[in-house]
A protein has these predicted regions:
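Short acidic/glycine-enriched loop/turn elements at secondary-structure junctions
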Residues: 80-91, 96-172, 195-200
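Short helix-loop junctions at transmembrane helix boundaries
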Residues: 310, 325-370, 381-389
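A hydrophobic alpha-helix feature that marks transmembrane segments and, especially
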Residues: 32-40, 262-300, 308-311, 383-384
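Peri-transmembrane interface segments
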Residues: 10-18, 223-226, 230-278, 287-289
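Hydrophobic, regular-secondary-structure patches
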Residues: 29, 36-111, 135
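Transmembrane alpha-helical interface segments in multi-pass membrane proteins
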Residues: 285, 292-339
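Basic-flanked hydrophobic alpha-helices used for secretion and membrane insertion
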Residues: 151-238
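N-terminal Sec/SRP start-transfer signal
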Residues: 1-28, 399
Length: 399
């Protein structure tokens, strides 16, 4: 078609074709980047929140959603039962205690958290200085908190815990972590679980709760239902009832924001599909109008409307495919550059991450390509009908 025509028609259609391909490519690049960034945000934010906590917590039913928790007795039999829940990869006891760090120049409210083992992997990944705590008087704090309090590795500080009386503990900083999640970095210090149990006045298996990690986030509520079935009618040794809560229930504002992000992605993809579709429709109409004489001649020689429409639809398929190839090449290249080099920074206090995160899953990428191709071809059916309106007699008479 446009690449085989000679003379004036060739020069008229070629710019229109280039614009159509460019419009398709730009639209696909925007859709690809939008999808990759949205998936990256969700993945990074979820990973950080779960790293500080877990997918599912089992706590005392009488808790009031604070870090000053009532204890449960997390028996070995309960731990063993929870370990057999489908999709559960780790079951750990944990303890938390609110306190206040006081230095010569400043003070800051904190939560000291002790857990058995799975948290070490997360904080070791985000360790920027020093090492993980090993003794009861050693703690890990964030570099953000260290900057606020003017502390550094190997410094010692007093932390005050207020119950019926005020108790002071002196801790040594063994290392600094940095997750770039400022809300939690300023709040949590990581210590020894036995030390936190002692601060709470508990012993043995008395803990704040049990944390469960899953292998698949999409199975969150299915796993939570199974955990509830095990714990709901199973009081502990002191008669306490259990309460099961998910990470989404513990962080409703953040996960509502992530769901709003999904809506934004849908809106952007729809807008870009409209823009790309408009470019392709315009390009196809120009190609058809530029080929009126050829269409009239082909009809005069016996070509049917169906045959000619299929010819132009094949041409549209070629143009869409070329635009998508360029869009994939440029879009994936930009994604890889951002993924490895973090070219575009962000304010972590506002966006919870310090750079634009990228996560492009193969399944999502394939679906985006297939969906874009099918929808683009679907909108081409309308303008291709122009072929059937062209009369050979009128074209020949005009000629």
């Amino acid at each position: 078609m446009y690449f085989s025509q000679e003379g004036e028609g060739k020069h008229m259609s070629r710019p229109a074709v280039k614009v159509a391909i460019a419009g398709m490519a730009v639209g696909f690049i925007v859709m690809l980047l939008t999808l990759a960034i949205a998936l990256g945000f969700k993945q990074e934010v979820r990973k950080t929140i779960i790293g500080f906590g877990s997918h599912i917590q089992v706590v005392n039913f009488d808790n009031n959603n604070t870090y000053q928790m009532q204890p449960i007795v997390a028996s070995d039999s309960l731990i063993n039962a929870l370990q057999h829940v489908p999709y559960v990869t780790s079951v750990e006891r944990f303890c938390t205690k609110p306190g206040i760090i006081k230095t010569d120049d400043a003070f800051q409210g904190i939560i000291i958290k002790g857990r058995e083992s799975h948290g070490r992997d997360f904080f070791e990944q985000h360790l920027v200085e020093g090492h993980m705590p090993n003794k009861t008087n050693e703690v890990l704090i964030s570099s953000t908190l260290a900057q606020l309090l003017k502390l550094k590795t190997n410094d010692r500080f007093f932390c005050y815990f207020i119950d019926s009386d005020v108790r002071a503990r002196r801790y040594t900083i063994t290392g600094l972590y940095d997750t770039r999640f400022s809300d939690y970095d300023e709040l949590f210090i990581i210590g020894n679980m036995a030390e936190v149990q002692h601060l709470c006045g508990w012993e043995g298996n008395e803990v704040c709760g049990i944390e469960l990690l899953l292998s698949d986030f999409s199975k969150l509520y299915e796993a939570a239902d199974n955990v509830y079935d095990i714990t709901a009618n199973r009081p502990d040794a002191m008669g306490n009832l259990h309460y099961t809560q998910t990470v989404e229930e513990l962080n409703p504002a953040i996960f509502s924001w992530l769901r709003l992000l999904d809506m934004n992605v849908v809106i952007i993809i729809i807008l870009m599909l409209c823009v790309s579709g408009f470019c392709m429709i315009s390009g196809l109409i120009i190609l058809i109008l530029d080929s009126v004489q050829m269409i009239g001649l082909m009809k005069a020689l016996g070509a049917t409307d169906r045959m000619l429409r299929k010819t132009f639809l094949y041409e549209a398929f070629f143009l869409i495919g070329k635009g998508m190839i360029w869009g994939n090449f440029i879009g994936v290249s930009l994604c890889l550059l951002q993924y490895f080099f973090h070219i575009v920074p962000l304010d972590s206090a506002t966006y919870y991450v310090s750079y634009v995160p990228i996560a492009l899953h193969p399944g999502a990428w394939i679906l985006l390509n297939i969906g874009t191709l099918l929808l683009s071809m679907l909108v081409m059916l309308g303008p291709s009908a122009i072929v059937s309106k062209i009369s050979p007699a009128k074209v020949m008479h005009f000629e």
